[in-house]
Amino acid sequence: MSARQDTDMEVRAHADHHASLRLWLRLLSCTTRIEDTIRQRLREQFDITLPRFDLMAQLEREPQGLSMSELSRRMMVTGGNVTSIVDQLEKEQLVQRQMQATDRRSFTVSLTEAGRKAFAAMALAHEGWVVELLGPLAENEQTQLHALLGTLKSGKSKHSKETK
């Protein structure tokens, strides 16, 4: 879905629609706009896709490496998707696969030294883009929004009724 489609959906949410629907559409349009910008900049400046960046970010957090199944679980994608991404990054010598000593059918994937250096540059740029894209909100507004979204993420509702 393009940012334009998200904006159009938000516009179609009339004032008489429930506030929750309008909020959901606003969250969707903001998230899509930010993600589209980051995808474009990663592609233009580093010739890398967002899923490849995400996989490298997972590996940066775990220097000893991760199994393919753990990468799949953390990224919430299929094993086939992870295999394809790892294949691409391995060709570019940004990651390496090592057979697991305990299970010769499984591999541990880790960043190479070149991968660590490349990811460090990408992560620095990514952080700057996020700061820029969230810049219209003051720091205290970002803190408030973070707290509100944390409540939403936890699933707790001030308005939910206890049922017995």
Go through each PLM region and give its residues:
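Exposed, interaction-prone assembly regions rather than primary DNA-binding/catalytic cores
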Residues: 143-164
